[in-house]
């Protein structure tokens, strides 16, 4: 499964990358972005199965990225230090919402949900 991370906080980004490489070696990180603008650019040049995104970014919120896309053919995991964005994340189609800091258990639960959806999509395309 290919993934991108959209996170502006270096510590949180390093934590996510560490958890993914240690516990989810099957996930290939295609790149990371630190803003709405760079997130849109990264999505235009990659085809991720999974996007893990912080909500609050320097130039907006992650939902701004999704609003600028015609569709999003990837699974979305939203991460935030605030629970107030959870309903928006679910309404927009996120597979899960994780409160920071992400842990192995919370990330594993979210990734397992995403894997089910990605596998289902692959089977339907065959």
For each predicted feature, which ranges?
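Structural motif
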Residues: 22-25, 43, 68-69
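Two-component/phosphorelay signaling modules centered on CheY-like receiver
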Residues: 9-34
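Acidic, metal-coordinating helix/loop segments flanking the phosphotransfer/catalytic sites
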Residues: 17, 32-50
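Generic detector of well-ordered alpha-helical packing
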Residues: 8-9, 55
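CheY-like receiver
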Residues: 41, 49-125
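Non-catalytic signal-transmission and effector/linker regions of two-component phosphorelay proteins
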Residues: 1-2
């Amino acid at each position: 499964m290919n993934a991108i991370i959209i996170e502006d906080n270096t510590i949180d980004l390093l934590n996510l990358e560490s958890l993914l490489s240690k516990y989810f070696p099957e996930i290939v990180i295609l790149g990371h972005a630190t803003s709405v603008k760079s997130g849109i650019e990264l999505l235009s040049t990659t085809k991720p199965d999974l996007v893990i995104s912080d909500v609050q970014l320097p130039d907006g919120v992650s939902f701004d990225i999704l609003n600028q896309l015609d569709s999003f053919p990837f699974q979305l995991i939203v991460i935030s230090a605030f629970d107030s964005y959870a309903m928006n994340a679910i309404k927009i189609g996120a597979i899960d919402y994780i409160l920071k800091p992400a842990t192995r258990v919370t990330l594993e639960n979210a990734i397992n949900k995403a894997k089910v959806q990605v596998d289902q999509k692959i089977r339907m395309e065959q």
